[in-house]
Amino acid sequence: MVVDPAGGRAPEAVTIRLLGEVGAAVDGRVVPVLATPRMSRLVARLTLAADGWVPREQLARELWPDSDAAQARTNLRKLLHGLRRSIPGPPDVVDVAGPRVRWSGCPAVRVDVVAFRDALAHGDPAAAIGSYGGELLPGCDDEWVVAERERLRHQAVEALVRLADAAAAGGRDAEVVGHTRRLLEIEPLHE
């Protein structure tokens, strides 16, 4: 157990879902961490950043494209503060270094999309599919979200094809059927 220096108890586990039904839980209790679409997009953008760090100016523009630069920066500062407050206890879920921000990668905070990508990177398609709850941020039509959603969907389909092929090669027909059904849920027109 991590102890919050302010005297409270830090959470044992924080789970954030960005794939499928968006939501969050702290120690198994549902919490409104992702109560707004912008908060969900912020967490997704930070956790999916290729090199980890994202320029603050870029985040501000992406999240508030219709606001002037000063207002967008102010809004981002408030949103980052809200994110930090919504997940209790140390360590902080975001790192800020001057003009850059990144997701801290704290082991107590599990993000489904990070678990999905990590499992694929480690050659574990079964674990990846276990983390894939559906489309990234359903209903969000930001260009970067749509592109990332398609990329993740394609990776999930490839993982399911590998699992189905391995099950077929091993004569595990029930597994083949299960993987094929899941594949068709994700990609109904897949052949």
How should each PLM-predicted stretch be described?
Residues 53-61:
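Short acidic, hydrophobic short linear motifs in intrinsically disordered regions
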Residues 24, 39-46, 59-60, 76-90, ...:
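DNA major-groove recognition helices of helix-turn-helix
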Residues 1, 5-9, 29-39, 45-52, ...:
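Intrinsically disordered, charged and Pro/Gly-enriched terminal/linker segments
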Residues 18-31:
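Short, Lys/Arg-enriched N-terminal segment that forms or immediately precedes the first helix
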Residues 9-17:
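Long, low-complexity, charged/polar intrinsically disordered regions in eukaryotic proteins
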